[in-house]
């Protein structure tokens, strides 16, 4: 095993053990700072190997990447933006959405989307994540933001590159690997804070779409450590209501996509 690979493996273990330290406020500021530094170094090191020509060829040969949709394929955009900004979500059209954000776990973070080996699984390809990735266009990466960009080219908030939540390229995609419903309140506050600090976003005027895709780690992992599984369900329900109330209080003109965990695993 190469020395570089050994270092990366150690850092990946730290990533799993200290994931909650990164996603929530804590008193251990020095530990957080050191961990973030190591995590970013490992991330950058691995990202170089994903982007090389050999790995890109493997992705194409294995069918892991979408085939490019030629421009000859029509994409009609008639009647997809309101003449006047709607006051009600019930009259909202695709072109009316100005801002998009994503809250969730590894699926939202785009973990391992371009992986060809186990080491690559730790990379977070947010730019091509289905709910909040906007790299390229729908012809190359069919994501929700890329579809909405056809109707509103000024759409903002989507992630643009392979990145961590610490990177500017993640924008309003704040998904974190291994997150559970208990992480939603903090991630929601982060989204609200980033929106309010973004000069491109008018909180009162712009329509915003926030997608939640979280819960499998609660129901496929955490629930196994509870004597009464109903406690996990009740906790998830309580925290979900909490974040919906927080969004309602802080983000007017917001439509929420709530993607439930699969009924069968």
Where are these regions (language model features)?
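N-terminal secretory targeting modules
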Residues: 2-103, 107-164, 203-206
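Structural motif
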Residues: 99, 209-211, 255
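Aromatic-lined glycan-binding groove of carbohydrate-active enzymes
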Residues: 254-265
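Short amphipathic alpha-helices and their capping/turn segments at secondary-structure boundaries
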Residues: 85-101, 188-204, 244-253
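Long hydrophobic alpha-helices with heptad-repeat/coiled-coil character
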Residues: 47, 249, 264-265
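Conserved SGNH/GDSL esterase-like catalytic core that processes O-acyl groups on lipids
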Residues: 118-239, 245, 263
